[in-house]
UniProtKB/Swiss-Prot annotation:
Protein name: MICOS complex subunit MIC19
Keywords for this protein: Acetylation, Cytoplasm, Disulfide bond, Lipoprotein, Membrane, Mitochondrion, Mitochondrion inner membrane, Myristate, Nucleus, Phosphoprotein, Repressor, Transcription, Transcription regulation
Family affiliation: Belongs to the MICOS complex subunit Mic19 family. Metazoan Mic19 subfamily.
Lineage: Eukaryota, Metazoa, Chordata, Craniata, Vertebrata
Organism: Bos taurus
Pfam family, one: MIC19_MIC25
Amino acid sequence: MGGTASTRRVTFEADENENITVVKGIRLSENVIDRMKETSPSGPKSQRYSGTYGASVSDEELKRRVAEELALEQAKKESENQKRLKQSKELDAEKAFANEQLTRAILRERISNEEERAKAKHLAKQLEEKDRVIKKQDAFYKEQLARLEERSSEFYKVTTEQYQKAAEEVEAKFKRYEYHPVCADLQAQILQCYRQNTQQTLSCSALASQYMRCVNQAKQSTLEKGG
């Protein structure tokens, strides 16, 4: 009796999900049950639920088959897990690559914007420098013009004083003679010009030159007659 393996009839029962069968307290999937029935020497394959599995199956044989099927199921799950892990790694790699490309694009855009800002800043600095130079030149020209106007005014003043002095000398020397102002027309024109151009006396320089020539000629003529 000890050398004979014990046998018993095994019953398959479907649970509420209709795709899981309980074998001696072990929950097996429908795929596992189908494969066990395919290798079983008993009964048609269509017998699935609420039936008897085989005529007699020993505990050792049942355990072996269940262990094999469970090992296959575990290997299948591990294979699927490996596939999912591989897909997850590939997806992570693609995401990392996309993020790297996006980061590079953002950096290039920032560099481009910084270069544009640097160019604009440099151009603004150049314009400021040009404006400073122009203002400096304008101030220089205004200063030179003011000096010329001042010199012209002084020249006219000195010339007028010299003329008055010469006229007084001539008048004192020739009191008996009646005389008329020399170059009176030009003198009147010059006086009117300076009144009208108090801020731009340089514009009267042409009249002043004519007046000086006229005065010198009159003076020379008077001296020659007196000599």
